[in-house]
């Protein structure tokens, strides 16, 4: 049985982690375009 607290923490961290990775990838992609790096 999964503890509700642990389940809540996991469900709370997953969207934040995905959002963080997306933002980091977007910033790197944008920076790469500015520097004209392929």
Swiss-Prot record:
GO aspect biological process, one term: cytochrome complex assembly
GO CC list: cytochrome b6f complex; plasma membrane-derived thylakoid membrane
Main location: membrane
Membrane topology: Single-pass membrane protein
Transmembrane segments: 5-25
Key words, A-Z: Electron transport, Membrane, Photosynthesis, Thylakoid, Transmembrane, Transmembrane helix, Transport
Pfam families in alphabetical order: PetG
Localisation: Cellular thylakoid membrane
Signal peptide: none
SUPFAM superfamilies: PetG subunit of the cytochrome b6f complex (SSF103446)
Transport found in the keyword field: yes
UniProt GO molecular function: electron transporter, transferring electrons within cytochrome b6/f complex of photosystem II activity
Highest rank taxon of the organism: Bacteria
Subunit structure comment from the entry: The 4 large subunits of the cytochrome b6-f complex are cytochrome b6, subunit IV (17 kDa polypeptide, PetD), cytochrome f and the Rieske protein, while the 4 small subunits are PetG, PetL, PetM and PetN. The complex functions as a dimer.
Family recorded in the similarity comment: Belongs to the PetG family.
Function (record text): Component of the cytochrome b6-f complex, which mediates electron transfer between photosystem II (PSII) and photosystem I (PSI), cyclic electron flow around PSI, and state transitions. PetG is required for either the stability or assembly of the cytochrome b6-f complex.
Name of the protein in its database record: Cytochrome b6-f complex subunit 5
Record organism: Rippkaea orientalis (strain PCC 8801 / RF-1)
Gene that this polypeptide is encoded by: petG
């Amino acid at each position: 049985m999964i503890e509700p607290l642990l389940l809540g923490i996991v469900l709370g961290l997953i969207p934040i982690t995905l959002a963080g990775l997306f933002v980091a990838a977007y910033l790197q992609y944008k920076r790469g375009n500015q520097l004209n790096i392929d």
